[in-house]
């Protein structure tokens, strides 16, 4: 199955060289990463020794952070240039991360996944709003996760607030993101996400919002999910 938006892939390919520049195109991810890493580590009772699949890993910011805490990480993405950057950066930091240029659907097809080969944790951060068929990714995650394994999905709610803050604010006013990074029509309401997850027998353990203060440059988590949000889902 081809669950790829080539324009989205090309968009991120053009920014590949700036993945590890904390002041570059991916500055928001660098600012957000400590918060989401701590959140994932807390909800999983520690990442050490656990098998993790990072879908849409890009240049490897989250993948490296999880590997640094002792996780056994596989990162997949369709942007070849970003993966080249990810491999080089991991090697320079002496981290053993398996990076592959493949969709999660094809990853599932090409690997004979036994129960022992399945993952304890899957992360899918800021990916669903960039693909044609988000539900397809969730279906694949179902078959790649161990029983009781955890799936972390972060995406953006399709609300007026999200449009103003993410597209107008972050892309045009603050210029934290390149213009055109997001398409409002691809934003996903929590009700839509949870319906897809329910159809695959995932149980939602928690859903929270995360927010950015442009003055302090800090992110924080609360219960407001009208903009960016992250869901923790357990495979049942």
Swiss-Prot record:
SUPFAM superfamilies linked: S-adenosyl-L-methionine-dependent methyltransferases
Gene3D superfamilies: Vaccinia Virus protein VP39
Keywords assigned: Methyltransferase, S-adenosyl-L-methionine, Transferase, Ubiquinone biosynthesis
Enzyme Commission code(s) on record: 2.1.1.222, 2.1.1.64
Enzyme class: transferase
Claim: Secreted is one of the keywords in the record: no
Ligand binding (S-adenosyl-L-methionine): 36, 56, 77, 125
Statement: the UniProt record of this protein carries the keyword Cell cycle: no
HAMAP family the UniProt entry points to: UbiG (MF_00472)
Name used for this protein in its record: Ubiquinone biosynthesis O-methyltransferase
Organism of provenance: Glaesserella parasuis serovar 5 (strain SH0165)
Gene: ubiG
């Amino acid at each position: 199955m081809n669950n790829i938006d080539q324009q989205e892939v090309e968009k991120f390919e053009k920014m590949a060289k700036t993945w590890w520049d904390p002041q570059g195109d991916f500055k928001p991810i660098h600012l957000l990463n400590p918060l989401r890493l701590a959140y994932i580590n807390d909800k999983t009772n520690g990442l050490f020794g656990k098998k993790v699949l990072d879908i849409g890993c890009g240049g490897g910011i989250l993948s490296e952070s999880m590997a640094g805490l002792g996780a056994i990480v596989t990162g997949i993405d369709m942007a070849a240039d970003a993966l080249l950057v990810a491999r080089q950066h991991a090697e320079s930091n002496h981290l053993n991360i398996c990076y592959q240029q493949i969709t999660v659907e094809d990853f599932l097809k090409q690997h004979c996944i036994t129960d022992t080969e399945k993952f304890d944790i899957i992360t899918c951060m800021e990916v669903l709003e960039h693909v044609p068929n988000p539900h397809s990714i969730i279906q694949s995650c179902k078959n790649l996760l161990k029983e009781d394994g955890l799936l972390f999905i972060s995406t953006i709610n399709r609300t007026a607030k999200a449009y103003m803050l993410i597209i107008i604010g972050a892309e045009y006013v603050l210029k934290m993101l390149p213009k055109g990074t997001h398409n409002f029509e691809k934003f996903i309401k929590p009700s839509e996400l949870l319906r897809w997850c329910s159809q695959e027998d995932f149980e939602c353990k928690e859903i929270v919002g995360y927010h950015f203060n442009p003055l302090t440059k800090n992110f924080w988590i609360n219960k407001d999910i009208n903009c960016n949000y992250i869901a923790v889902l357990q495979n049942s």
